[in-house]
């Protein structure tokens, strides 16, 4: 059975901070998902704001899902840094009924101002390292629409290889097996990631104060 870590944990890399998806993030997330291009790229359906709040709650309560909002560190400032610096989200799902140690990865960089800066790559790598260390994941998958060339290129550069193609959904499935060498590399990456814990409901408190744990 998968056990959840404390939800009030944020992961800070060189260019991004991954913070838990909270209710305060929903209005901006909902605004992003009015973009038809993002809906197509993520294979999502448009939701009302009320439905978006319900979805956020269900995601945070699902023991087989981890969802983090990606913050662009260039914009982390002020009391609402965890909202103002929002640039996308990154998720892993343990939804393989035959093997709970297989996780599907998703990444979205929604803000045009933050694209082309390597934030997607860093976010995925941190999330994979998190999954290997805390959830004992031994294989990652990614399902990407064939027209989403940017995501396909990103995951292939990270070492994912095509395992199947759905002509019906026009979707490519990629896989990344965590070998011993890859595990060591991912865990080493975590040496450069700062884990913040925050006692309040505002991740900005710990980010701006420098509160962190090893």
Q: What feature does the model see in each segment?
A:
Residues 102, 131-145:
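Conserved GNAT acetyl-CoA-binding A-motif
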Residues 116-130, 149-157:
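Conserved acetyl-CoA-binding loop-helix of GNAT-fold acetyltransferases
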Residues 1-114, 134, 161-214:
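GNAT-family acyltransferases
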Residues 124, 141-142, 165:
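Residue-level detector of family-conserved "landmark" positions at structurally sensitive sites
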Residues 110, 141-152:
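Conserved beta-strand-loop-alpha-helix junction that forms the acyl-donor binding cleft
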């Amino acid at each position: 059975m998968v056990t959840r870590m404390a939800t009030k944990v944020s992961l800070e890399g060189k260019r991004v901070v991954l913070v838990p998806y909270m209710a305060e993030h929903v209005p901006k997330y909902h605004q992003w998902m009015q973009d038809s291009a993002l809906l197509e790229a993520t294979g999502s359906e448009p939701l009302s704001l009320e439905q978006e709040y319900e979805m956020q709650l269900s995601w945070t309560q699902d023991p087989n899902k981890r969802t983090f909002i990606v913050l662009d560190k260039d914009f982390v400032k002020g009391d609402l840094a965890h909202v103002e610096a929002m640039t996308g989200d990154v998720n892993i799902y343990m939804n393989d009924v035959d093997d709970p140690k297989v996780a599907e990865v998703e990444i979205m960089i929604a803000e045009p101002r933050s694209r082309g800066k390597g934030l997607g790559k860093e976010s995925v790598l941190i999330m994979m390292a998190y999954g290997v260390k805390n959830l004992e994941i031994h294989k990652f998958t990614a399902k990407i629409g064939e027209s989403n060339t940017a995501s396909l290129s990103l995951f292939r550069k990270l070492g994912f290889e095509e395992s199947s193609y759905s002509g019906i959904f026009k979707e490519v499935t990629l896989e990344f097996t965590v070998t011993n060498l890859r595990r060591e590399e991912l865990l080493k990456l975590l040496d450069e990631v700062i884990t913040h814990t925050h006692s309040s409901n505002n991740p900005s408190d710990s980010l701006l104060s420098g509160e962190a744990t090893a």
